[in-house]
Amino acid sequence: MRFHVISLPHTQTTKEYVNCAYTEKVRRFCMMMKGLGHTVYLYASEDNEAPVDELITCITKEQQVQALDGKHFTEAAFDNTLPHWKIFNGNAIIELNKRLEKKDFICLIGGASQEPIAKAYPNHISVEFGVGYGGVFSKFKVFESYAWMHSIYAMFKNPTMVDGSFYDAVIPGYLEPEMFPLQEKKEDYYLYVGRMVDRKGIGIAQHVCQEMGLKLIMAGPGKDPKIE
């Protein structure tokens, strides 16, 4: 099979951007598909660590710096009316036209922000392959979890009458084992890895460890005011 994977306009597909879940999804998806023997075209920026058949640069690092205007990449907006989104999506559309074949898949990670790409190729299958966001639009969606799939159903439809969509699927997130090496000699602590926001459960982790008198190590982006 042939996959055209569209990344984001404000990141590079390298481990330096591990804090961006969607960029990591792109990088790891490319790794898996190439590992299975498929053809992978990656539409991204200039730096890339994913094994692909071709990297197609749709936005330069200089353009990214101008777009972020001093902000961290995790604060970037998902809005296809912004200039850098127009540059990225526009170039992706042009470059896709040079490479697309009849049964190819267009894999989108930016939700509705990348809808213009799907609209440019209505006769191809555009798949939102890592839905962990709210702005869905396509007929073909792969959700991160059943909980999130049903949240989206309730968000856009009458929750008492949702029958789902035949082409929706759930494929949990995938990781690289070498990023989590086995430690045979254990130390006495608990570990929280994730964004520092309450909805991810940091309050529960903190409360449990406080009550049990145990050490808690926390790793992840952001700073929640509830952290003590």
Question: Predicted segment positions?
Answer:
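Catalytic cores of nucleotide-sugar-dependent glycosyltransferases that transfer UDP/GDP/TDP-activated
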Residues: M1-E228
